[in-house]
Amino acid sequence: MQKKALNYCVSLLLLGCAATPAIAADLSIGDPKTDLGELKLSGFLRVKYQDKSWTENDHKLTFDAARINLDYTSPKIFGHLEYRCYQYNKLCDFSTLVDANVGYNINDSHLIQAGLQPVPFGPGRFWESNYYGGVITQIGLEDVHNVGLKYQGKFDTGTQVELAYFTGDGGSYSGPYSEDASRYTTNFVKPEDSSLTHLDEQNMFIGRVKQEIRSLPEPMKGNIGASYWQSDIENKTNGQTGDRQAWAVFGNVSYNNLGFGLTLGKNEMDNKDPLTPKTSLMGSFDDNFMVANEGMFYTADVSYKFKNVGKLDAVMPYAMYSSYVKSEDGYDDSSRNLLGVAAYYKNMSFVAEYIMGKNDFLIGGPSSSYAQGGDDDTHELLNLQFYYNF
């Protein structure tokens, strides 16, 4: 009942923001340089038009999603809240909390942060330039938000260190289809089929180190880094405890408006499940799916931003390759590749993406896509989006 009430309030707030574009240009009070700080409201409203190769479409422009950010900034204390809602059948029938955290600036170079926040694994929250995301998002390693405590330090050598401990995931929220997969982040979820094992990830120790490459000639910039993930996986069905160990190495290079990023790593999970020892049940965005417990992952991204193109502020074409190469013999690899372009004009964004997926549950694949696979076809999605940012 409380989640439904929160969902209703968010819907009203979003409609209010959409109806007042003049006010939405500056929804803030206070000054971030003073002890009282600044409180700022921001977000977006998004509509979409999609064409899918694997199913018939109604080809209608529909409301897709909305995001609300509430940020508090002061010299010492800061906080961040992000809430999103999506439309499946009706306005905001799936909604979820993404972030809710507070932090303390020890000084200009060191801080601590507590609450529901992004996990410091891989090059950043997002590993690519596009708006749809890579296939590793569904494996539960990219754009992950869990509950815990993080330390971040920046040093004169150009080194950034992040050390974090997460007690567990951010929980489930409100959706029309699934009891436990109504969440933004891909986590282990409670099965709706009683024959499947219920897993829960806890005690996550995660670290990331980034190093600026200062020897590059101007105007090149770049960094390299590595991250590691160690956690317990509680098998709630038989009471045993397994673990996850994952690592990633990454690098990013830019030359003026050209950017390139590469991430690779390995995911290895022991679920202590005699029934399905090679796969585990995970879920997000109101869907459940099985994921192979062991595999290598790869993401490559390239983009170029053209500034001041006619009346547009910028136009950015981009491309992505992402794959999950499973270690188990006979398992088909999962891949998602993308070509896209984004155009920006004042507080509006226009996005066009052509996405190709193979053994990708979100792009026409079966529910076993991220586990055994079994689909020899490549499916395509044309994804057109319009954003109003406030």
Give the role of each language-model region.
Residues 68-72, 100-104, 149-153, 207-211, ...:
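Residues on the lipid-exposed face of transmembrane beta-strands in outer-membrane beta-barrel proteins
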Residues 37, 57-66, 94-98, 143-147, ...:
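Residues that define the transmembrane beta-barrel architecture of outer-membrane proteins
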Residues 171-196, 236-238, 269-291, 360-376:
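Solvent-exposed loop segments that connect transmembrane elements
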Residues 47-53, 65-67, 74-78, 83-89, ...:
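Transmembrane beta-strands of outer-membrane beta-barrel pores
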Residues 207-213, 217-327, 388:
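Detector for outer-membrane/organellar transmembrane beta-barrel domains
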Residues 30-51, 55-173, 210-216, 299:
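Outer membrane beta-barrel
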Residues 346-390:
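Predominantly the C-terminal beta-signal and adjacent terminal strand-loop region
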Residues 39-45, 79-81, 112, 161-163, ...:
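Transmembrane beta-strands of outer-membrane beta-barrel proteins
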